[in-house]
Amino acid sequence: GSIEIKSSDTRIYPKIKMNYLSTDEDREIAGKSIKIVRRVVLESKAFKDYTPEEYRPGTQFKDNESLAREAGKFANTIFHPVSTCKMGNDENSVVSDNLKVKGIKNLRVVDASVMPTITSGNTNAPTMMIAEKASDLIINDQK
């Protein structure tokens, strides 16, 4: 995805393009995830008494590509987007390990967007840890 700053006025919201399911890897993971849920819910003994049925995306969709396409029509992030400004050393990373935006002087990103991948639990605690580490980095830079 991308974020475009439209104005130096902080009251003007940026243009945000999420680009969900835009990579082969995203679509493959979405398809595999739906297949896992199907196996656990529709085929396991644990749910048999509840006679579960699949409404979306629908059992007619079998391959990862069609599953991802259908998932894209109704899926959302539940307000936990991460990895939009990924930290790392690879070409797709936005910030370095000191949280500084690559190629821009005096700008850091200090939020869940720097996580390279989403955590398996709630994102709140890791985000607070990132902020705590950032405060140390900023203080040390001033020494």
Label each PLM-derived region with a short phrase:
Residues G1-P126, A134-K143:
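FAD-dependent oxidoreductase catalytic-site/capping-region signature
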